[in-house]
From Swiss-Prot:
One of its GO terms (biological process) is symbiont entry into host cell. Plays a role in the inhibition of host immune response within the nucleus. Interacts with cellular nucleosomes and immobilizes the host immune danger signal HMGB1 on chromatin. In turn, prevents HMGB1 release out of the cell and thus decreases inflammation. Also plays a role in the wrapping and condensation of the viral DNA. May also promote viral genome import into the nucleus. Pfam families: Adeno_VII. Belongs to the adenoviridae histone-like nucleoprotein family. One of its GO terms (cellular component) is host cell. All late proteins expressed from the major late promoter are produced by alternative splicing and alternative polyadenylation of the same gene giving rise to non-overlapping ORFs. A leader sequence is present in the N-terminus of all these mRNAs and is recognized by the viral shutoff protein to provide expression although conventional translation via ribosome scanning from the cap has been shut off in the host cell. This is Pre-histone-like nucleoprotein. It comes from Canine adenovirus serotype 1 (strain CLL). The keyword Transport does not apply. Induction: Expressed in the late phase of the viral replicative cycle.
Length: 132
C-alpha cells in the first residue's frame, strides 16, 4: 500500500511499502526533499545498463627468490588454504568474487588458452607416436 504525501500544489511524493517514489528533481519550497536521492531501485533494476569497469589490482611484486620459496613451501606442506588461492585468483582477475563464482572474461580467456595448449600437446604427442 502506498501513502501519498503531497505539498500544497499537489505535485506528489509517494511512500511505497519499501521506497519513496515520484517527486522533485530539484529541491525547492514545494519539494523540501530531493526525492530522487532517496529512491532505491528494486533488485534487477539496473540489469540492462553497462556494468562499471572494475579496476584491476596489480599483483604484489615478488622477487624470484620469494617465488621459489613459495613453490618449495607448497611442495613440502601441500597447497595453501583455499582462501589464499581465491585471493590470488581475484588479484590476477580470474574470478569476480563480488558476484557468483563465475569466471571473468580474463579468467575465461586464460581457461580457453590452457585448453588450446592441452589440445595442441595431445596432437603433437599423436604425431610423434605415428612418426616412430
Amino acid at each position: 500500500m502506498a501513502i501519498l504525501i503531497s505539498p500544497s500544489n499537489n505535485t506528489g511524493w509517494g511512500l511505497g511499502t519499501h521506497k519513496l517514489f515520484g517527486g522533485a528533481k530539484q529541491k525547492s519550497d514545494q519539494h523540501p526533499v530531493y526525492v530522487q536521492a532517496h529512491y532505491r531501485a528494486p533488485w534487477g533494476g539496473k540489469g540492462r545498463r553497462r556494468p562499471g569497469r572494475a579496476r584491476g589490482v596489480p599483483l604484489d611484486p615478488k622477487t624470484e627468490a620469494e617465488v621459489v620459496a613459495t613453490i618449495d613451501e607448497v611442495a613440502r606442506n601441500g597447497p595453501p588454504a583455499a582462501r589464499l588461492v581465491l585471493e590470488a585468483a581475484r588479484r590476477v582477475g580470474a574470478y569476480n568474487l563480488r558476484r557468483a563464482r563465475k569466471l571473468t572474461p580474463a579468467g575465461r580467456a586464460m581457461a580457453a588458452m590452457r585448453a588450446r595448449q592441452m589440445v595442441n600437446q595431445a596432437k603433437r604427442r599423436k604425431r610423434r607416436v605415428r612418426s616412430k
